[in-house]
Amino acid sequence: QLSAFLEYGLELIVGDVLSPLPVEEPVDYIFHGASVTASKDFVEHPVETILTTLKGTEHLLELAREKQVRSMVYLSSMEVYGVVDPEHWNVKETDYGYIDPLQVRSSYSEGKRMAEGLCGAYAHEYHVPVKTARLAQTFGAGISRQENRVFAQMARSILKGEDIVLHTDGSKAHCYCYTSDAV
């Protein structure tokens, strides 16, 4: 909702994060949420998934450095935790589990982990004031009608008055975050 940005005097800059963003004006804050988000794309386009995450983050960190921003927030993912010990349901920020780097679906998780590392490196070497937020899978307004992730399937079933059908045995639990709750 662009009107919400304008109401607070914020300017939304739209561009392709795979290219450096030509911004002439001063920049105070950067909120970096650009990412490939569809699991199907992680598997069908793992190289592009990784490069979008890394190059996009690099370009925004360079912009933050050049403009000497007051702060930058990188929206990462709880997927950086990988597979953690099932005995510990309470995961801390320092609890990194296993991610198989050779599994193509890991392109998203590994890309996010590496981007967090890049943020830390820019903070250390160039003093870029960057913070990281690890979000659960986020959904909300603006999702494509063709979206096939579970929350979209459930929403479609609810809107049609149909039963919600699980395509698994139902034993897995997942965390979801509504967009406005993340903001």
Where is each model-derived feature located?
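Glycine-rich phosphate-binding loop and adjoining beta1-alpha1-beta2 segment
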Residues: 1-8
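NAD(P)H-binding glycine-rich loop region in Rossmannoid oxidoreductase-like domains
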Residues: 10, 14-52, 66
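Hydrophobic pocket-lining residues that define ligand/cofactor binding sites across diverse proteins
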Residues: 64, 123, 158, 166
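Substrate-positioning beta->alpha
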Residues: 107-110, 118, 131-132, 143-156, ...
